Amino acid sequence: MSHGLSPRPATAKKSADLKGTVRIPGDKSISHRSFMFGGLASGETRITGLLEGEDVINTGKAMQAMGAKIRKEGDTWIINGVGNGALLAPEAPLDFGNAGTGCRLTMGLVGVYDFDSTFIGDASLTKRPMGRVLDPLREMGVQVKSAEGDRLPVTLRGPKTPNPITYRVPMASAQVKSAVLLAGLNTPGITTVIEPVMTRDHTEKMLQGFGANLSVETDTAGVRTIRLEGRGKLTGQVIDVPGDPSSTAFPLVAALLVPGSDVTILNVLMNPTRTGLILTLQEMGANIEVMNPRLAGGEDVADLRVRYSELKGVTVPEERAPSMIDEYPVLAVAAAFAEGATVMNGLDELRVKESDRLSAVADGLKLNGVDCDEGEASLVVRGRPGGKGLGNAAGGQVKTHLDHRIAMSFLVLGLASEHPVTVDDATMIATSFPEFMDLMTGLGATIE
């Protein structure tokens, strides 16, 4: 199993109105990158609001293993970085646990160095394909040893001098884009990434913030060209990590579905590459008020007031998928209570997440009485306003497949369903949102 912890099932039951004001743990994407860029930069980086889930902590441990000094004082993480180009060879394999982001980005960061680095992970991460990151690294001259199908364990050895490349990202993947850019940091000359569909852009924004010479151009067709000059100096920064929109999704959708709810969520990252879920829910009729919008560390941030809403089904534009890929499971839960059908297309990326998320969602919905159809890369959900008949009175358990987002999504389903909803394991929620149970029960949710 993922953590060597024995599975701990959890059950969510129909709840009365959810009320309160909450702060969500820091954004996972920005937290991973804060540890990485702080560990690489010259001088001191100070981070508040860091997401202290296992995934991010594993990225921090990897940076420590390559020479960064990391300590915590009160609520602040303080990093003394090694300086760009000065990472040290790790003495042991770098263990990323369940973290696809940390693993793939670090492969880019250190793979081009002229020493061996070995990457390992848990049972779930070991099944996930790494080839999409390894292919461009091979073009830069990196030698790759990997398990069958370019899976972990992977050992990388960079060339004496890496080649700068121009790489067109073949799928909408911020991880692949970021891995190539990070490899470019220790490569002489200009590394260019061409991105046909825009994905989350935290790597570009944060590298510019740390002083990298990086430019972004967008043509009339929306194709982005990112150029990075290698071997420049990065300088330590002060970072306050905004709340993770992917974690915000759970209390937000719960408040929309439980009658009488009125919940305010503070300090949420509103980067336009991450707000597809909020936009979609608003199209479905969700009452989501964006309050106090502001800029923090180059990123858009706001507070959200969310109230119970009667939703109606919509067709989600396929091009929106990259900006909400992690939120489809909880969107499918919202759709289960909407009037009419919600159609979601372009979901092929969901099949290679922590689990095959598409089939995991469809199976869980069916187990709990939701009418849905799973296609090759699509999901259609026909909702039942009020949740009558939804849930599983017999206590049938949703198979989470060690996937934190599946577990949290189905616990939200149970809060508004007529019958309880049980998930087979809730231990792995700690990878991204350790405070989930306490935060939800604090708002009035019944989860046990």
Curated annotation (Swiss-Prot):
Functional pathway: Metabolic intermediate biosynthesis; chorismate biosynthesis; chorismate from D-erythrose 4-phosphate and phosphoenolpyruvate: step 6/7
Record flagged with keyword Transferase: yes
Catalyses: 3-phosphoshikimate + phosphoenolpyruvate = 5-O-(1-carboxyvinyl)-3-phosphoshikimate + phosphate
Question: What would be one Gene Ontology cellular-component term for the protein?
Answer: cytoplasm
Q: Which InterPro entries match?
A: Enolpyruvate_Tfrase_dom, Enolpyruvate_Tfrase_sf, EPSP_synthase, EPSP_synthase_CS, RNA3'P_cycl/enolpyr_Trfase_a/b
Q: Which residues form a coiled coil?
A: none
Keyword terms of this UniProt record: Amino-acid biosynthesis, Aromatic amino acid biosynthesis, Cytoplasm, Transferase
Protein name as it appears in the record: 3-phosphoshikimate 1-carboxyvinyltransferase
What organism is listed for this UniProt entry?
Answer: Sinorhizobium fredii (strain NBRC 101917 / NGR234)
